[in-house]
């Protein structure tokens, strides 16, 4: 998993509330366990019409938001069924941070487990970011170490984060990476077990 320390990037405002995981990545794109290539399905029913043509006024189709790495979202983002493909699709598109007033619990956990930073701010702070991102300057900065979001106009907003999750994000540690850190202890245990209980090795 890639470490997350600081992100300076373009922010796209998506003011809709209660965006569920089926809207983030529709079910027809869930037939793979590969993380790459899922960007094409991200917000598919918002981005394309019934004939597969881009819907010009959807935020991610607008030229000024192309290449956005931060999504400013409405309340209760990521609700609905559990699907790890949702953060995968966002990250494959290039979005590394989502800012909202709240996230569905399972989606929130899936984000942290995959290296996508979910940031919870107060409603009035999200409203400021939404407003400013709709202007001429769309650039924001997220500093995980300092736990701050800097708006396009320079306003600073503090966010809370579980210290254990923060540490893992800063170090780029997922479950596998965490386990590999204890590789030496695991090897010692397995060698000792092989001597003490050789019948288990048969």
Curated annotation (Swiss-Prot):
Pathway: Amino-acid biosynthesis; L-leucine biosynthesis; L-leucine from 3-methyl-2-oxobutanoate: step 2/4. GO terms for cellular component: 3-isopropylmalate dehydratase complex. It comes from the Bacteria. Keywords: Amino-acid biosynthesis, Branched-chain amino acid biosynthesis, Leucine biosynthesis, Lyase. InterPro entries: 3-IsopropMal_deHydase_ssu, Aconitase/3IPM_dehydase_swvl, AconitaseA/IPMdHydase_ssu_swvl, IPMI_Swivel, LeuD. It holds the Pfam family Aconitase_C. It catalyses: (2R,3S)-3-isopropylmalate = (2S)-2-isopropylmalate. It is an enzyme of class 4 (lyase). GO terms for molecular function: 3-isopropylmalate dehydratase activity. Belongs to the LeuD family. LeuD type 1 subfamily. This is 3-isopropylmalate dehydratase small subunit. The lineage of its organism: Bacteria, Pseudomonadati, Pseudomonadota, Alphaproteobacteria, Caulobacterales. The gene is leuD.
